């Protein structure tokens, strides 16, 4: 199973319910492994819901996959099939909410795409029509219209350019740090460098995690380790091969 297939399967499941307050007796202690953008978002939303949260990372915030990501927020034609595209649409909306909550600087300017190969260009046009049928505000514009949006780009020879107006861009490292800062302000603990090495159980109940910085009590563990799938296989016994 590759990363994109995994995301498609996740798209078939409902999104997490709205945040709710835990009572003191209910408050779980959750260990989030990985302080990248995904781990930081998980930590923020769990902290907001009232959970006790600890985040660990073997190097530091946004030091691996999140450091190299393009930062493109989109529900583009490449998000196939439709349930995966729907998940991406919800993700775009979630970024708008995060921006309001935490003042994360997101640039909402849309995106432009086109191909020099005529056959691929015709396929792009069909894909944009499909996007429109799925409720995405995307369309085909001329080179002149594209030049008005991006005057410093040479669109000579280009035609039928795809414009996805809902797309945005974010600095993933900055967004990660803002999310973690918000989490720690609500009581979350951030520890690095610290690496998960094993888990401890009382029968079938998880009670703690062994890390390179010591034992951490935990009721639940969330693995947000990006491309480092070896730890997922070791701890969760799930093999997630990666491909680029």
Predicted regions and their residues:
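Glycine-rich FAD pyrophosphate-binding loop
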Residues: 48-66
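N-terminal Rossmann-like FAD-binding beta1-loop-alpha1 element of flavoenzymes
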Residues: 30-54
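N-terminal secretory signal peptides and thylakoid transit peptides that target proteins
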Residues: 1-13
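Helical element adjacent to the flavin cofactor pocket in flavoenzyme catalytic cores
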Residues: 166-212, 219
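A short, basic/flexible loop-to-alpha-helix module at the beginning of a structural domain
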Residues: 15-26
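Dinucleotide-binding Rossmann-like beta1-alpha1 core, especially the glycine-rich loop
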Residues: 71-149
